[in-house]
């Protein structure tokens, strides 16, 4: 590389890193902290989600009865979603508003609070820091803007860092110090070695994380995915591009089918399933205050989706990875709304894929079934980017890789600041004062008189 160009890139890289380094460090640390949120919550919630049937083949309450129990126990916030599981020893999960969940014993109607409140509070704090630096109210938009710009700057730092890393000579002696850790180094040499090695090995993952983060943060980036794949961008930010499902107008006085009948119709046409979720109509403004938007994935403030519910229409862990679609009634702007169910099957690919089944609520007849295969190419790529951002697209292995790369980014911030400090604030070298040279005693003069 031309030395002059290299010098220009170096100073741009350094100044940009100094400006956004702290924000990048916070985002990287919190990203690593919430990497395995779903598995930890599932483990901590294991007792709260388990029930003992009173007898083999004991009848369950109807879903309407369970919802009535929830409304009685939680009158302030209306139910917004219901998730059922196939096991006889499983609870029914009921979402409240936009950020809370309770479990219902299907045999007794007992309403339980989720366990792991400490873990939930911790992850909620980490996500708020990750997405908008824990800002609240009107300042949340400012925090989100700062993290969005810092994410783009981090992508730029990664690319310029690769140019600066590029060895002048491609031989083992020149490349070894920038490809692997060296023992016995201290101070500037150690930080330089760490910065180069960690940056090189984590760069591919960090490019994916920052690129996908930009697509999540910015509508123009999300639209670009659809444009590059030759598809019309959806009106709303995110991958949701399905048209409303039209429900035939029923005869006057016709009542909707019971929820159990609607769930049974969906179960009948589904393969071995893990969860089935129905989002209920919620009055405007009924969301739980302060709750994370229903299904809003990390870094994305929109709907959750194609897949499951991270914000707990179904508790994470039962529903699998955070999704981007919504299980909710959908129809035309006027007229009856379709009952839209999100089905997570056991045998699925990609791992985040869900099926959406839209029913006529008055007849329980299927109006439309949409699977991942039905998505256009833009929506497929957009959804992959959403789950690559958390690593969930590749299961726990992907989550581990994303966590390690995020943790590596924390060290990049540390070593970057340490190298900058040594550059701008050099250590004062104390010069040892040489002891004064010993003074020779005066020579004796002997005068011998003759």
Where are these regions (language model features)?
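Conserved histidines in hydrophobic membrane contexts and catalytic metal-binding motifs
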Residues: 1-450
């Amino acid at each position: 590389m031309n030395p002059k160009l290299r010098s220009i890139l170096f100073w741009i890289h350094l100044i940009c890193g100094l400006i956004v380094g702290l924000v990048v460090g916070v985002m990287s640390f919190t990203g690593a902290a919430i990497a395995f949120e779903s598995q930890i919550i599932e483990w901590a919630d294991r007792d709260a989600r388990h029930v003992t049937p009173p007898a083999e083949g004991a009848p369950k309450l109807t879903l309407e009865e369970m919802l009535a129990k929830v409304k009685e126990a939680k009158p302030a916030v209306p139910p917004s979603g219901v998730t059922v599981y196939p096991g006889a020893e499983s609870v029914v999960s009921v979402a409240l508003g936009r950020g809370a969940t309770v479990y219902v014993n299907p045999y007794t109607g007992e309403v339980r609070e989720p366990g792991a409140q400490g873990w939930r509070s911790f992850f909620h704090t980490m996500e708020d820091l990750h997405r908008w630096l824990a800002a609240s109210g009107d300042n949340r938009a400012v925090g989100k803007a700062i993290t969005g710009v810092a994410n783009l700057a981090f992508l730029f730092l990664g690319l310029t860092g690769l140019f600066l890393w590029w060895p002048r000579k491609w031989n083992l002696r020149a490349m070894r110090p920038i490809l692997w850790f060296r023992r016995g180094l201290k101070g500037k040499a150690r930080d330089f070695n760490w910065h180069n090695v960690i940056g090189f090995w984590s760069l591919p993952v960090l490019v994916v994380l920052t690129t996908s983060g930009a697509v999540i943060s910015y509508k123009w980036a999300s639209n670009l995915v659809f444009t590059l794949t030759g598809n019309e961008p959806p009106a709303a930010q995110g991958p949701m591009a399905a048209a409303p499902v039209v429900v035939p107008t029923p005869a006057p006085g016709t009542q909707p089918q019971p929820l159990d009948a609607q769930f049974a119709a969906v179960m009948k046409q589904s393969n071995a399933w893990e969860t089935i979720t129905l989002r209920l109509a919620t009055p405007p403004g009924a969301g739980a205050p302060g709750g994370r938007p229903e299904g809003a994935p990390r870094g994305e403030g929109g709907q959750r989706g194609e897949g499951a519910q991270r914000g707990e229409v179904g508790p994470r862990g039962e529903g699998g990875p955070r999704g981007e679609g919504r299980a909710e009634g959908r129809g035309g702007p006027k007229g009856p709304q379709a009952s839209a169910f999100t089905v997570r099957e056991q045998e699925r690919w990609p791992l985040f894929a869900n099926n959406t089944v839209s029913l006529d609520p008055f007849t329980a007849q299927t109006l439309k079934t949409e699977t991942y295969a039905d998505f256009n190419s833009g929506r497929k790529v957009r959804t992959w980017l959403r789950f690559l951002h958390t690593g969930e697209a590749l299961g726990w292995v992907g989550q581990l890789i994303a966590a390690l790369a995020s943790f590596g980014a924390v060290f990049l911030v540390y070593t970057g600041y340490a190298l900058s400090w040594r550059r701008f604030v050099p250590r004062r070298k104390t010069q040892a004062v040489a002891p004064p040279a010993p003074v020779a005693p005066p020579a004796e003069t002997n005068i011998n008189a003759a």
